[in-house]
Design a protein with these regions (language model features):
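Phosphate/dinucleotide-binding and metal-coordinating scaffold of catalytic cores
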Residues: 1-340
Length: 340
């Protein structure tokens, strides 16, 4: 993980990081992951270790502050809005996606108070030159309230003819990756196409870098726990199986044997690498962050335990639904992984 240590905030007051009206909204309504995101432009100076608020349209970084209400657990009362460490979650899976070979913008986390803010580099602005991009939902011609309701045939009709074979394969790989990690908040506004150049005469569209990647599987009943938010199967379903992903490949003109190999390769890599390369490499401070249970006595686990429990559950689901062959000795419990 890329943790910015020793950085100071310049011209960024607390009310900009944590707007009172946003905290009030989070406190009063259960709006899931999509409604949590808030960001503003910053300048990132690595030499001075400064994060500075800016209204310069050419600055190339955004900061997404954590929401105080989302990481506050109430010992008594309603915790429907308890979605802690979302930005650590996002940074972790953005890093994994990058390592899997996907085009991912630079991103990092920086501590402030009880949680971490998230910084990401814009992919549509290079040295002040803007590259126009359009999300899939806009191509389809629907409003934001329909971002989870898009049918696969709509993608096929309005988007797939606009991209080349290489990008189509990358998109399929990303859909498989998203199912494997449980990216339940993937929707039609989280995927976009960008023009290859900034020329007024440019007509070629390419798949944009991927962004807003996180697992919803660690938040229990407080968020939609589907394997993937985008409706790419023949019907809405919580768990995607191997047959679903092979059917999607066929609809994207991707060879069945290639699709089979992608499913197996990505699933096994995720299962083999998640603990060693992503959980174990977190700082002890992050691993020991308290993560409260929503059921039972509402005791707190650590973030490390929650992530390992998630891995154990994903291993079972991947074996059951994606029919990936997993060696018996690799089927470890959370406790076994914790004390390795």
């Amino acid at each position: 993980p890329n943790i910015l240590k020793g950085y100071s905030y310049v011209n960024i007051e607390d009310n900009r990081l944590h707007p009172m009206e946003l905290n009030k909204l989070a406190q009063d309504s259960a709006i899931g992951l999509s409604g949590v995101q808030y960001k503003f432009a910053v300048n990132l100076d690595h030499k001075k270790k400064e994060i500075q608020f800016t209204d310069n349209k050419n600055d190339i970084y955004f900061i997404k502050p954590y929401n105080k209400q989302r990481c506050t657990f109430k010992g008594r009362g309603n915790n429907d809005n308890y979605i802690p460490y979302l930005l650590i979650n996002e940074h972790l899976f953005m890093t994994m996606a990058r390592d899997f070979g996907f085009d991912i913008p630079y991103n990092a986390i920086v501590k402030e108070g009880v949680d971490y803010h998230y910084i990401i580099k814009r992919y549509d602005n290079y040295a002040g030159i803007k590259f126009d991009h359009t999300d899939f939902l806009t191509f389809i011609g629907k409003s934001s309230k329909h971002k989870y309701d898009i049918k696969f045939n709509e993608l096929k009709k309005h988007v797939f003819d606009l991209i080349n074979e290489d990008d189509m394969l990358d998109l399929y790989k990303f859909l498989v990756f998203s199912v494997i990690i449980g990216h339940g908040d993937l929707h039609a506004k989280n995927l976009s196409l960008i023009y290859k150049s900034s020329s007024l005469y440019e007509k070629e569209l390419r798949l944009s870098p991927f962004y807003d990647i996180a697992t919803t599987k660690i938040y229990g009943k407080n968020v939609d726990s589907r394997d993937i938010g985008l409706n790419i199967a023949s019907r809405v379903k919580k768990f995607f199986n191997r047959k679903d992903l092979i059917e999607v490949a066929g609809n994207m003109s991707i060879d069945k044997a290639l699709a089979e190999s992608i499913i197996d390769k990505y699933a096994l890599r995720f299962l083999n690498d998640f603990k060693n390369l992503y959980v174990d490499t977190l700082s002890n401070e992050i691993k020991s962050l308290p993560f409260y249970r929503l059921k039972g006595y509402r005791t707190a686990d650590t973030l490390e335990v929650v992530l390992l429990r998630y891995l154990e559950k994903r291993r079972k689901d991947i074996k059951k639904y994606l029919e990936v062959e997993i060696k018996k000795e690799e089927e470890k419990t959370t406790a076994q992984m914790l004390f390795e």
